[in-house]
Amino acid sequence: MQKVLVIGGAGYIGSHVVKALLAEKFAVTVYDNLSTGQECNLFKEAEFVKGDIADCELLEKTMSKGFDAVVHLAAKKAVGESMENPQLYARNNINGSINIFNAMVNTGVKNVVFSSTAAVYGMPQYLPIDENHPINPMSFYGFTKYEIERVMDWYSRLKDFNYTALRYFNAVGYASDGSITGREKNPQNLLPIIMEVATGKREKLLVFGNDYDTPDGTCLRDYIHVEDLASAHVAAIKKMLSEHKSYVINLSTDIGTSVLEMIQSVERVTGRKINYEMAPRRAGDPSTVVATNKYAKEILGWSPKYTNIDEIVRTTWNLEVK
């Protein structure tokens, strides 16, 4: 049985990755400091090590048990916070990742799937965004992710080290079977905030800008279901274990959904009216961010199963009313 270490495996995306790996009969160990990850997201079938990526000794001790691959999802990810406290993000994201890679090299673990982000691209210069799009992150968070990609690229040239950087677009939804119940704390993303309005936890949603060059005037984004993200991680591990090559791959649906379309979807699924208010544009918000997933299909043999926004919203609502 092939063994995978999932660093950050108690978090929102990480727990779905663990679930997908267990379903494919991998032996899984989760390494998480539970700063944002939650114990309720842990699976009894997976071993758990409570640890921080700053702890080089524990990382190396854990990896010395022998793993075929690492999935690295541990990171600080609040864009605003990264601009206010770049030193925290440099220390945690960049230095912490180097700690992981050094532990891999020192223990002979040769493959890593890295949780990167569409934020490395910055303002789109053309659409849909592909992997050759210019890199120009507009936040320190996005910068840290690209720096980590560059470190991996150099390690792959200098050491016996393979990587797949998966550049996520907007992750949404929850496990369709309801097996993962831990909600993200202090949500920053659109759908969880709309759900807080739907459940009465928040009075209203602010829609930033209705004068964009889009069909309804609100921003368009590419929303990808978290189970589709998880299945791509499994496909990436299998690809590296069989071919021993490195890749950088977008994970997206190639479909744009506007803010108003998301609100309307939640209203259809929940049967509840969403209270929202138009507000001025936020500085730096692009009107449209949509990516092609052609390369993911070609390299990983992967394509998203969730392409209907109502189906995605329903998996989130099912958790709210559980």
Q: Residue locations for each model-derived region?
A:
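N-terminal Rossmann-like NAD(P)+-binding domain of SDR-like oxidoreductases, especially those catalyzing
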Residues: 1-174
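Short, flexible active-site loop motifs that bind/organize anionic cofactors or intermediates
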Residues: 8, 49, 72, 79, ...
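Amphipathic alpha-helical recognition patches that constitute DNA-binding helices
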Residues: 12, 139, 167, 185, ...
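Short, flexible, glycine-rich and Lys/Arg-enriched loop motifs at helix boundaries
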Residues: 39, 169-190, 200-221
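The catalytic Tyr-centered alpha-helix of NAD(P)H-dependent dehydrogenases
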Residues: 126, 137-144, 183-190, 222-226
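C-terminal substrate-binding subdomain of Rossmann-fold SDR/epimerase-dehydratase oxidoreductases
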Residues: 193, 199-322
